[in-house]
């Protein structure tokens, strides 16, 4: 029996992981990034007094982990949406209901993935922890994109990724600057522009990679066939995607090695966090336990994401909303609500560097990692997905990047800047709300060649 109990005890090792930390030869610590700090604002300290009275060590460890992972967040009640979504899907209660419950269930899962990657970073060190956070930081968007590609829903992929970038640049950042300015109305809020500048350079590069395939179709003369134009656009997009991934790798090296100090979230001694923001300096769960929970959470995210992809058209028909509006506006708002709330809370506390790190860092990660990776995955699957997001979508992205860059150019902030960003987001949301133009071939704009250049405008 000992050979059976010991592995499970290792996987279920409890929150007293700091004992292992003190006994190890290396100190378990990591640089705190904006994503780590943002997610910590939604955590709450667990009361383990009852759990410690359990006589069985293995059972006590399992209960401790359950309490830390499931009950250690202010979003605990939202976990109820997960079994409800599974039941609704099993008994066919209604596909729009499945879509709504799945969206709600993704919210606490995304926050817990951030928590678990931070816990693993205590053991792996700052570099590997940073890479893990970079990979899992937008796990929901990446999983939805891959599942949508597997179902040949190219437009859903493009819409959802575009919506995530717009949401971070305008909604999250705008809300943070607005409420941060209101809460600190008697003093000017300042932030470090160095990190923002790096992110904007990369976002502009990503925008260039979206513009060129779009402009290529307009630049082609009438002698060039539509199929040839689409082939050139697809080849350019795949080449650009490889370049974007190289740029993202360089960005990770810049962020995690050469210029790490620019991206580490700093804590002020004279402005310490209160009890509402729990910042642990030691791990509360063990490595293998955290890894097992991370794998489990990822599997559940994949399950709910599959529900979202399968039912999005039914929700669109039932609610009278276009798929573009649901994908660009609703998916990012609900799916990343936890991370967004954390950014706003830290802006309230006059910690704009953390809020900017969350919004700009997430937008950069999607633009230079998730988007090109989706193109490469589609290429592997034999699906013709390019970087041409069409004229309306690409214009919205360009204007969002330009407006945000101008807003942050002087390193200071007030509530008026946040209000302008929010209003810009409302205008873009209204645009996609009234846009009821159907897409060809069941939304898969990347699969069907256009008959003439004039159809580019209506695509």
UniProtKB/Swiss-Prot annotation:
Region called Cation selection, residue ranges? 137-172, 335-370
Might you report a single GO cellular component term?
Answer: vacuolar membrane
Q: Which tissues is this chain's protein expressed in?
A: Expressed in roots, stems and flowers.
> Can you provide one Gene Ontology molecular function annotated for this UniProt record?
calcium:proton antiporter activity
Description of how activity is regulated: Inhibited by excess of Ca(2+).
- Record membrane topology: Multi-pass membrane protein
Question: Cytoplasmic side of the membrane: what ranges?
Answer: 1-67, 117-129, 183-195, 260-283, 349-362, 408-417
- Induction profile: By Ca(2+), Mg(2+) and Na(+).
UniProt cross-references to InterPro entries, sorted A to Z: CaH_exchang, CAX-like, NaCa_Exmemb, NCX_ion-bd_dom_sf
Name the family the entry cites. Answer: Belongs to the Ca(2+):cation antiporter (CaCA) (TC 2.A.19) family. Cation/proton exchanger (CAX) subfamily.
What this chain does, per the entry, is described as: Vacuolar cation/proton exchanger (CAX). Translocates Ca(2+) and other metal ions into vacuoles using the proton gradient formed by H(+)-ATPase and H(+)-pyrophosphatase. Involved in ion homeostasis in association with CAX1.
What is this protein identified as?
Vacuolar cation/proton exchanger 3
Q: Which organism is it from?
A: Arabidopsis thaliana
């Amino acid at each position: 029996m000992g050979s059976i109990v010991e592995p499970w005890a290792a996987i279920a090792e409890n929150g007293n992981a700091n004992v292992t930390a003190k006994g190890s030869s290396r100190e378990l610590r990591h640089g705190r990034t904006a994503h780590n700090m943002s997610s910590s604002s939604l955590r709450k300290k667990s009361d383990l007094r009852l759990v410690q009275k359990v006589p069985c060590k293995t059972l006590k460890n399992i209960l401790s982990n359950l309490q830390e992972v499931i009950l250690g967040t202010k979003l605990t009640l939202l976990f109820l949406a997960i079994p409800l979504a599974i039941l609704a899907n099993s008994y066919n209660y209604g596909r729009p209901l499945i879509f709504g419950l799945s969206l709600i269930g993704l919210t606490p899962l995304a926050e817990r993935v951030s928590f678990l990657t931070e816990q693993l970073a205590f053991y792996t060190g700052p570099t590997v922890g940073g890479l893990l956070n970079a990979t899992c930081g937008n796990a929901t968007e990446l999983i939805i994109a891959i599942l949508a590609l597997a179902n040949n829903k190219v437009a859903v992929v493009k819409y959802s990724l575009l919506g995530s970038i717009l949401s971070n640049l305008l909604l999250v950042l705008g809300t943070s600057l607005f409420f941060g300015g209101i809460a600190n109305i008697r003093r000017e809020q300042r932030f470090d522009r160095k990190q923002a500048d790096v992110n904007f350079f990369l976002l502009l590069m990503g925008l260039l990679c979206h513009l060129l395939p779009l402009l290529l179709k307009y630049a082609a003369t009438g002698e060039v066939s539509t199929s040839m134009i689409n082939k050139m656009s697809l080849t350019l997009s795949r080449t650009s995607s490889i370049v974007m991934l190289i740029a993202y790798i360089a960005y990770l090296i810049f962020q995690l090695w050469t210029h790490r100090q620019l991206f580490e979230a700093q804590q002020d001694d004279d402005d310490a966090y209160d009890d509402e923001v729990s910042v642990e300096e030691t791990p509360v769960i063990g490595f293998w336990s955290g890894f097992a929970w991370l794998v489990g959470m990822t599997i559940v995210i994949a399950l709910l994401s599959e529900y979202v992809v399968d039912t999005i058209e039914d929700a669109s028909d039932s609610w009278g909303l276009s798929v573009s509006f649901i994908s660009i506006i609703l998916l990012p708002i609900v799916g990343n609500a936890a991370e967004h709330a954390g950014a706003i809370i830290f802006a309230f506390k006059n910690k704009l560097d953390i809020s900017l790190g969350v919004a700009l860092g997430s937008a950069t990660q999607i633009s230079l990692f998730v988007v090109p990776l989706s193109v490469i995955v589609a290429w592997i699957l034999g699906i013709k997905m390019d970087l041409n997001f069409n004229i309306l979508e690409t214009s919205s992205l360009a204007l969002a990047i330009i407006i945000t860059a101008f807003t942050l150019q002087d390193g200071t902030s007030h509530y008026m800047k946040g209000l302008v960003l929010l209003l810009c987001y409302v205008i873009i949301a209204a645009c996609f709300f009234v846009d009821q133009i159907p897409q060809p071939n069941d939304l898969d704009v990347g699969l069907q060649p256009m008959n003439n250049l004039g159809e580019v405008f209506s695509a």
